[in-house]
Each structure stands twice: as structure tokens, then as C-alpha cells.
A protein has these predicted regions:
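Long, contiguous, secondary-structure-rich segments that constitute the structural scaffold
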Residues: 48-65, 69-132
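Long, low-complexity segments enriched in small/aliphatic residues
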Residues: 1-54
Length: 132
């Protein structure tokens, strides 16, 4: 394939998957944005399907998972409503303090519906990881 495609200088087609850092990807932790954010599949949804069912939301809330060490250094307690920002957006989400996440990383379930006033502050109240 790499012999038949017209590639720009420096472009490569690899025979197996190779990690490529995104423009806000791995290695972009800064003083302003000191934590990595990863998405994971939520137990009450299939991607965004079933994300609108109140009974499922009641038993499996949309929560940001954070390591106890990171939570303590930021005065975050389990159940707190917190603001999370990135260079491209902001969400508000409930915190779940758990040792199941490594320090320096937060985890947000994928599939939450975007709930923001796009004519106002544009802050997503639904905890949609794609906002970040």
C-alpha cells in the first residue's frame, strides 16, 4: 500500500498500529492542566445509547474517578461536584474518589450526553468527556 499511495514527505504507512501522540495527547501535561484524562465504557450505557434513562442514571451516576492522592491535594471529597477544564472546554461532574485510578490520571465514562447552554457559558453539565 505504501508503494501505491501518494504520500507527503515524512508521511509513513506502518504495517502494524503505532502510537501517534495527538496535539493535546500524551506528553501534554502542564502546570495549568496537570492530569491526564482517559475515557472508559460505562456499565449502564453502550456508548451513548441508554444514556437518557433516569433509572439507569440513578443507579450508575456519571462520575469522574480520581485517585485519593490527587483528590486530597485538590481538597476534593467523594461526591463533590467539581469543574474540570481543558484547553478546549469545561464540564461539571460528580467526583468519585477511588484507588482504582493511578495518580496523575482521571477517568470519565464515555457516552454521557452533552448538556450545555451554547448561547451562554458553554459549560457542560452532563459530564461529557468529549467536551474536554
Amino acid at each position: 500500500m505504501s508503494r501505491t499511495w501518494d504520500l507527503e514527505e515524512g508521511e509513513v504507512i506502518y504495517p502494524i498500529p503505532v502510537f501517534q501522540a495527538g496535539f493535546h495527547g500524551y506528553g501534554s501535561v502542564t502546570e495549568e492542566f496537570p492530569l491526564y484524562c482517559c475515557g472508559f465504557h460505562h456499565k449502564s450505557r453502550t456508548h451513548s445509547s441508554f444514556g437518557f434513562i433516569p433509572e439507569l442514571e440513578a443507579v450508575a451516576r456519571q462520575q469522574l474517578w480520581v485517585n485519593p492522592a490527587d483528590a486530597e491535594s485538590r481538597s476534593i471529597e467523594d461526591g463533590d461536584l467539581i469543574a474540570v477544564t481543558s484547553p478546549v472546554g469545561e464540564i461539571r461532574i460528580e467526583a468519585k474518589v477511588t484507588p482504582r485510578v493511578i495518580p496523575g490520571t482521571v477517568m470519565i465514562p464515555q457516552g454521557a450526553w452533552h448538556k450545555a447552554n451554547m448561547n451562554g457559558d458553554k459549560v457542560d453539565e452532563g459530564g461529557c468527556v468529549n467536551t474536554l
